[in-house]
Amino acid sequence: MKPKILVIGSTGKLGVKLLNFCYSKKINIFGITGFKNNILLNTQSKKYNIKNFFKLNDPTQNKKFKLFLKKNLIDIIYFLDYGYNSLIYADIFLNHNRNSQIAIANKEMIIAGGDTLVNKIELTKNKIIPLDSEHFSLMNTVLPIENLNKVYITASGGPFYFKKKCKS
């Protein structure tokens, strides 16, 4: 049986690359989401024959996507967007899916979700797959939190790409 794959953030740089890769390997995608680039989302749904696609900036579509998460068992979910807004989707997903793979390329989600996210993933017998070395490092930090004074996280892309550099 083919795995059901869901991509949150298919219109971003990583999402575009993942869809192209899957297409080249004849891997079917079960569902995709986008936020701002609705034209690309529509193009992707047609080009890759993806019937389940959701424009998350549209309140009606957002509601439908949440229902979609509740009603469908997903084998692999990719969080390729940025920001912590996808925590709500992760929570819905985790309430309805077991033994799935959760691939995260979204460090804001890991930081904002913290132990709560990681513990819920473990409790629901899902498996987290950090997709970047930063995320892997964050997930495997075992220092006692009370000994931490500061944490520096570099911002090389995503929402920080066009921000002015700050001197500290």
State where each predicted segment sits.
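Rossmann-like NAD(P)H-binding beta-loop-alpha module
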Residues: 91-94, 114-168
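Short internal beta-strands
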Residues: 30-36, 52-57, 106
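Beta-loop-alpha module in the N-terminal Rossmann-like domain of NAD(P)-dependent dehydrogenases
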Residues: 61-94
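A short helix->loop->beta-strand "cap" motif at the edges of active sites that frequently abuts
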Residues: 49-52, 95-101, 124-126
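ADP-ribose/adenylate-binding Rossmann-like module
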Residues: 81, 96-112
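N-terminal Rossmann-like dinucleotide-binding module
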Residues: 1-48
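General beta-strand structural signal in soluble alpha/beta enzymes
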Residues: 7, 55, 76-80, 103-105, ...
